[in-house]
Design a protein with these regions (language model features):
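A cross-family phosphate/adenosyl-ligand binding-site feature
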Residues: 1-99, 105-170
Length: 170
């Protein structure tokens, strides 16, 4: 996501939770420093005074990727104990776009109720599920589909996956 946004010259503000950092080291070949270098600005998740914790800080929206069920629950219940949860709460109260890339499976009734609660507030629940009509060949193809779906929500042009209806898939 950050690589694509940097290429497109989109300003980004990165908040990485402790578990987000663990995901990066366990699931990718990237270093934390490399990921931080992709963002315009970074903030520590414990810094509740960061600019993004205030509604006066103008942003187009927020993407939480990946979004754990713990973070989903915190946001759904207004428990702003981290900068991620606080910033998400601010994004909701300021009526800005919030996208949660949840990836837990299977989902419990509690998870679904929290998602429904947030969806009713206008939060976009966008699990990184690929569309197989795109005929993904690599993990990057699958990742790019999820990234592209997020960018679509912000009307950011990209060519990360083939659109339905082009000559490749009709």
């Amino acid at each position: 996501m950050l690589e694509t946004l940097k290429t497109l010259n989109v300003e980004t503000h990165l908040i990485m939770s402790e578990w987000g950092q663990k995901c990066i080291t366990m699931e990718t070949e990237h270093t934390i420093d490399y990921v931080k270098s992709l963002a315009t600005t970074t903030s520590d998740e414990k810094n509740m005074a960061a600019s993004v914790s205030s509604g006066t800080h103008k942003i187009d929206g927020m993407i939480i990727a990946p979004c754990s069920m713990k973070t989903l629950s915190a946001i759904a219940n207004g428990y702003d104990d981290t900068l991620v949860a606080r910033s998400a709460g601010v994004t909701i109260k300021e009526d800005r776009k919030l996208i949660l890339m949840v990836r837990e499976t299977p989902l419990s009734a509690i998870h679904l109720e929290n998602m429904l609660k947030l969806s009713r507030l206008g939060v976009i629940i966008l699990p990184p599920v690929t569309a197989f009509y795109t005929h993904p060949k690599t993990i990057d193809d699958i990742v790019n589909h999820g990234v592209g779906k997020c960018l679509d929500q912000f009307d950011i042009d990209h060519d990360l996956y083939p659109r339905w209806g082009n000559s490749q898939n009709t």
